[in-house]
Amino acid sequence: MASPEAPEHVVQFALDKLGGLDYLVLNHVGGAPAGMRARSAQATRGLLQAPPSSGSRPRPGLRLRPVTRGRCLQVNLLSYVQLTSRALPSLTDSKGSLVVVSSLLGRVPTSFSTPYSAAKFALDGFFGSLRRELDVQDVDVAITMCVLGLRDRAPAAQGVRGVTRAMASPGPRAALAVIRGGATRAPGVFYPWRFHLLCLLRGWLPRPRAWFIRQDLNISAAAAA
């Protein structure tokens, strides 16, 4: 998904092979490490910088390492938009569903995750707005936003090892929650369930919410990261 051309090719391949789409599950991300340095302007620029297309020449002095390309805006947001735009006509015909796998950090900001949280908030804003647009146009395409935490089999767990005390949830159970949410056309999925409470506390009781988040952080490890 780091290539601007890849999302359209992926959807077109699926349409050619399957003849149409009933579900589109978006579950990919270019991760960012947690820690004090992750909030720097340079780290954020690395996350949000789209890679040059295959037909363009990179600017002198600009070299995007593979790990940087994996964190770019193309992977974290634009590819989601491209995949959705290309698949939406087919999903409209089938009255299908969009399932967007996101993170708690796209609803509740926490410490030492500035670039990653920025990308996830952008996803929540885009698909929240798209849901409203489809509704007012009477387009019967469901959008399910999945708010997940750390999974024990996810690469993202390695990026926060030692920084957070939060326990990783079993990956298969998180996958089952996503499948159920998409199949039932639920507007939102929270796994573990307590994340729904944290999202509610964000507006109602910000101080207790901040206290809960702080308990899961290892400040000294984050400072050294």
Q: What residue ranges belong to the model's regions?
A:
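Rossmann-fold cofactor-recognition segment
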Residues: 1-5
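Active-site Tyr-X3-Lys motif and surrounding loop/helix of classical short-chain dehydrogenase/reductase
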Residues: 9-16, 34-38, 42-47, 59-63, ...
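Conserved NAD(P)H cofactor-binding loop of Rossmann-fold oxidoreductase domains
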Residues: 27-32, 51-57
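Active-site loop immediately N-terminal to the catalytic Tyr-X3-Lys motif
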Residues: 61, 108-115
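Active-site helix of classical SDR
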Residues: 84, 119
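Residue(s) in the substrate-gating loop at a strand-loop-helix junction
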Residues: 103
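SDR active-site lid
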Residues: 132-193
